[in-house]
């Protein structure tokens, strides 16, 4: 079965693993998935990224973060914004602040995948991939 939207698949795998309190989750490897994972790590939502394999058989293993003794997930929600059937683009002024700045919007720009904060600092807009909080 082919996967028409690998970003949605990645977000769903992370969301499901987080809800079940798994320590790691595996996602199919791609440049876009790796870029999104690096933004999530930089923003403190995941703790570690490991790559396995090469080419079309590559996989990315993400180590999820939890807080407190009850292992409360760091990622509370992940929402896909721009979809294959309806792309959402925003300029610098139109970039959203997720939960008043507590969450992160992941943006695909001409300078790579980055958080909304980094895109605002650099003064560029792009495609809003997802919201994470």
UniProtKB/Swiss-Prot annotation:
GO cellular component, one term: ribosome
UniProt KW rRNA-binding keyword: yes
Superkingdom assignment: Bacteria
Keywords (A to Z) from UniProt: Ribonucleoprotein, Ribosomal protein, RNA-binding, rRNA-binding
Task of the protein: One of the primary rRNA binding proteins, it binds directly to 16S rRNA central domain where it helps coordinate assembly of the platform of the 30S subunit.
Family, as annotated: Belongs to the universal ribosomal protein uS8 family.
Listed name of the protein: Small ribosomal subunit protein uS8
């Amino acid at each position: 079965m082919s996967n028409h939207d690998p970003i949605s698949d990645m977000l769903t795998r992370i969301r499901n693993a987080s809800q079940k309190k798994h320590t790691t989750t595996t996602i199919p490897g791609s440049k876009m998935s790796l870029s999104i994972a690096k933004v999530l790590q930089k923003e403190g939502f995941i703790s570690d990224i490991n790559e396995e394999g090469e080419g079309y058989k590559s996989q990315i293993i993400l180590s999820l973060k939890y807080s407190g003794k009850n292992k409360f997930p760091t990622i509370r929600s992940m929402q896909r914004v721009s979809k294959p059937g309806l792309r959402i683009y925003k300029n610098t002024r139109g970039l959203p602040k997720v939960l008043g700045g507590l969450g992160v919007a992941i943006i695909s720009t001409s300078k790579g995948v980055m958080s909304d904060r980094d895109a605002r600092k650099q003064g560029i807009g792009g495609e809003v991939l997802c919201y994470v909080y």
